[in-house]
Amino acid sequence: MIETNPLIIELPENMKGKDYVIGDLHGCYDELLQLLKFVKFDIEKDRLFCVGDLKDRGPKQNECIALLDKKNKQGQQWFFSVLGNHDYVKNFLSKKLLKDYYTNLLTKLPYIYSVKHPFFKKFFIVHAEMRFFLQNMNNEEITNQLLNNNLSDEIFYSLDNNNIILSESQRKNIIWARDNFQYFVNKNQANITMGDFSFMFKEKNKQIVEKLKIFCGHNVVPFPIVIGHQIYCDTGACFGYNKPRLIEKFAKWGNRFFYLSMIDVNTGQVYGCVTSEKSEIYTEEDYKYNYKRGDVLTMNKTIY
């Protein structure tokens, strides 16, 4: 499937409504509908971008994939997703799927969406990492150059299928790599398995995202946050569905945060829909809220 997926799809500015970004869906269809209802999402005007991983783990992967085929009254697509690593792995397809139909939808997913925006030149959607065009620079150099205004935004804004040629392994890195995330974890000596996310709350993170908006998932975080030069928004929605092997991996974090996150691209406002039967969701100030599955909340802080 990897040979057929386009590398980059460019989309025009949304002149009618808002753009939103949703974290890794993993079949959490009902929670997505709750979020759309909460923000009064209008399919005739608004657009929703997913950072990938529509399927596996959650209860309604079929419904999530089928969103790719939905149109509004004008016949326009309103739901968009990039390719995630779980979307790429064919053998994860459920036996109940009508494989030809769903596989055909997944083979059309791009690795990257490049989207024009009225408030800033563009924003980007990618599943894991977008470092393929900066092969000779490490993450610290990228960060420093972004902060010091030495890295030209044009290197991002000029990307299209005509000037980027990638090998299969490089394409796989876009949906599988964790280098950027792990670099900053190691650099700050953070033990994320013990719930240490203090390294995320540095002021320079917000300075970076003011220059460059790259939304991604793949690495689970307790709330959407800027790490390095990317905005991570996978908040472990699927773990709320009592998958023992997966929940055990994050048990040290406590029963905190399993929810599906959605971001208003215009404002950086974060919304969440709880997937855990019972949970405590922590914001940056460690405010604690007791919620049950299906509850929707507005986070106290924006991410930019």
What is each PLM-predicted segment?
Residues 18, 22, 27-99:
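Core catalytic region of metal-dependent phosphoesterases/phosphodiesterases
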Residues 23-25, 52-55, 85-87, 128-130, ...:
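Active-site metal-binding loops of divalent metal-dependent hydrolases
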Residues 91-120:
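Extended active-site neighborhood of metal-dependent phosphoesterases/phosphodiesterases
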Residues 191-304:
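Acidic, His/Gly-rich catalytic cores of divalent-metal-dependent hydrolytic chemistry
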